[in-house]
Amino acid sequence: MTITKYINTLEYTYDKNHAISHYRINEGGYRNKGELLESIAKYHRGIYAEVNPNIAWNAGSDIESESASVKSSGASLGRGIGGYAATADEKIEAYFKNVSSTTFIWIHMNEDTQEVIEYHMNRAEFEIFVSKFTRVCNSSNHKELAIRFRKHTKKMEAWFESMATT
């Protein structure tokens, strides 16, 4: 595992009155926080791509050049795959069976300082991360299970630090 820190330079605005997605980049479409963080990670790498909110999940990587999937607080793990799996384990198994990414990036940003921290994990590390820091809930349509990542916490940071030193 590696940890990368940088200061965000991508300009965005925050609109607390917008229904769901509160962030806008260059007066483009609204993004939720996860989409904003993915955009920041791409921008840091010199990539600018418009987010398509109509794509729930695809087998490709968020950052193709690194074969990397980007995740952050509150994200769903593979929403729309695994169908109506009876258990969370089946849903997680379907995700790992279908995802093509070999690197997984957990991204967190302090909005006051704009400091961004990326935690880069391989597949085995990410599987452990998923087992420790996700919760099971009903999806928004209440027809299937949703695997959601918990909020970024000090406990999570301690886990990342311990993994980075091993």
Residue ranges and their predicted role:
Residues 1-166:
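Nucleic-acid endonuclease domains
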